Amino acid sequence: SDPLVDCKKCRERFRGDKLIEDAGGDPVGKTLAEISAMMQSLRIKCPSCGASDFTEARAFNLMFRTFQGVVEESSTAIYLRPETAQGIFTNFKNVVNSLHPKMPFGIAQIGKSFRNEITPGNFTFRTREFEQMEIEFFVEPGTELEWHDYWCKKSREWFESLGLAGDKLRFREHAAEALSHYSNKTTDVEYLCPFGWGELEGIASRTDFDLKRHQEFSGEDLTWFDQEKNTRYIPYVVEPSFGADRTVLTFLINAYAEEDLGEGKSRTVLRLHPRIAPVKAAILPLKKNEPRIVEKARARSEERRVGKECRSR
């Protein structure tokens, strides 16, 4: 859940923690009462009307609720998934029995998720329906922090290999008091967008919480038998979780540039990294009506063509 506050003057609703962040405060790990107190001490103003009169912060359920069938009652209530992770955990035993993987191993998935965001915005960065990419990486208990650091390193290498680097990319580790109840270490990968720091990926060590809960309520044995050590245990999980839509938007933001051509003229340029650019290079003859030049351009293009990445015109 997120901390919801209402402006008493204009009735607009906001996330209290985001208002505090925008004002330079740190709401991480704060209770609802502490969120309310921080908003008062920082004298936060409503982004819509400028008033500084908000309701007390209260928890807001992010899950979309609906009903199966024609009768709306508690027994038919269902929810749209807020993440793809749980579908992976429910299929853990199927994957193990079918593929017989060796520890450590991962299961990856990309798909739609739905969250009833209080304040969607910043184009596709924060929406109520979005695409998620998640990996549940199963490891031996006691090695999860080592694997957490491994995935942080791999994530940094991946983002930097596609052009996101420098002081606009940061890896922010959660303080102990700000960790989710299931996690013993979490790191957020954030990028400095025009609207502030935004999370692109969360890398969480989820311990064995999820598999334990699914085992408890399903009655299925979700333990793993290590033949080499002759031991049985419930695997721990390290989860790299990406927002696909916001990551694509961030690549576009990072590539966007406006060049000053002088004399009051400018042009907009999209400097995409070569690895994600749809066109790597183009050979363009200056004169289409001179066969010699056109033929030479085509010959050069054929020499450098790799698949369909280089196009001649």
Residue ranges and their predicted role:
Residues 1-313:
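NTP/phosphate- and nucleic-acid-binding module
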